[in-house]
């Protein structure tokens, strides 16, 4: 398995996204709603509803950053990007070790990624 760690967003973009996500009533729901059978056992977080206006707006920003990044394009050769999800964990929440499904509701997922908006204090998933 290959890992690519790379600064995708600049400080201004991160700040913008964080402020958007901090607004009240953004439509956060139980992350298990989109988890596969195995992942739902270890998934304990919140996820922004994909149909919300803010999710669509921020997904477009992330997608554009990925598609316009030369290093990511050379590493992945993306043909289509779909299924961008925004998740957060409060105290006591985590997303344990899991394998992403090859097929998700939005299509085949040959490659998955995590974009951290905060410093990586992530210890329970596949990022070490």
PLM features per residue range, with description:
Residues 70-128:
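Catalytic core of non-heme Fe(II) oxygenases with the double-stranded beta-helix
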Residues 1-78, 83:
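Non-heme Fe(II)/2-oxoglutarate
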């Amino acid at each position: 398995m290959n890992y690519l760690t790379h600064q995708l967003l600049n400080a201004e973009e991160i700040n913008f996204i964080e402020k958007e996500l901090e607004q009240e009533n953004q439509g956060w729901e139980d992350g298990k709603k989109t988890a596969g059978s195995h992942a739902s056992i270890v998934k304990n977080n919140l996820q922004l509803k994909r149909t919300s206006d803010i999710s669509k707006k921020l997904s477009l920003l992330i997608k554009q950053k990925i598609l316009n990044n030369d290093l990511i394009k050379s590493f992945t050769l993306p043909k289509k990007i779909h299924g961008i999800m925004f998740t957060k964990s409060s105290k006591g929440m985590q997303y344990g070790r899991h394998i992403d499904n090859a097929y998700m509701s939005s299509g085949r997922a040959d490659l998955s990624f995590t974009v951290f908006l905060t410093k990586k204090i992530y210890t329970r998933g596949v990022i070490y």
